[in-house]
Amino acid sequence: GRRIGNISSIITVWSVCSTNMMNSWVYRPLAVVESDDTCDRWDRNGMNFLFHWKAKYPKFKISLFTIPERTSEEMLELLWRHNDWVELCVHGWNHESNFECYGWDYDRTTRFMERVESLGVYKKIFKAPGWTITPGYNGYPADEKALISKDPQAVYKALTDKGYVIIDRHYNAPGRPENAKVVCIDDQDIVVHMHTWPMETGDKNGRNGYQQVVEEHGEPWDNNTEFYFMSEAWERGMFKPCQK
């Protein structure tokens, strides 16, 4: 087995997840359901909700943006048994903060993704913690000594060269290489974006933890909804281009 990261550290929450299509709770006849922060922690994996939804909505599918360093081989094996309705995508490496990718350059990004790929269970779909894949456009510049400051496009470039689809926010558009394969989540009315754990925010629509969705919003799908993985929606051309 491999070493699992320090899963007791706190993943910070900040207000970058503003109200938009990403945090809309209107009914979806077509749904690409995805969530952030799957890992081993009992209060961060949300397994009870996943099985509740699958039992209640037999067609249910979900793409889990999983923290590789914090997810054991045993957890991956358990999730892989359900790969007909659970898809594993990549959410940083250890998510020690929302600015993890500010500490990456091209080579470090490549090495992390090679380690992820060696496990053989993850789709080549990546989302940066806190959406901070490049500095500045989100209002949070990187320290000049940070690795990302040498080349603000380094993470994009490495992921693109390795064939990853990058899930991103609209405000990062000016910082992307033109050849990057990007899904701008702000523009996608078929995506249901959630977290495995409660988001304590004053923005009612931004309260998108699994339990909050059930108790405060209600699931924006039913048994007539057609569900697709992120990978399926990409392959079928279902995502809208970024509205730059």
State what each model feature region is.
Residues 2-12:
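Extreme N-terminal basic, low-complexity initiation segments
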Residues 14-85:
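Active-site beta->alpha N-cap acidic-glycine motif
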Residues 22-23, 56-58, 70, 160-171, ...:
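C-terminal domain-boundary segment and adjacent tail
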Residues 32-41, 65-67, 99-104, 195-198, ...:
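The substrate-binding groove and active-site-proximal loops of carbohydrate-active enzymes
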Residues 34-36, 63-67, 89-91, 127-129, ...:
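A cross-family glycoside hydrolase active-site/sugar-binding cleft signature
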Residues 41-42, 72-74, 96-100, 132-137, ...:
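Short catalytic/ligand-binding loop motif for oxyanion handling, primarily in non-cytosolic enzymes
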Residues 58-149, 188:
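Metal-dependent polysaccharide deacetylase catalytic core of the NodB/CE4 family, i.e.
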Residues 139-187, 234:
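His/Asp/Glu-enriched short active-site or ligand-binding loop at hydrolase and phosphoryl-transfer sites
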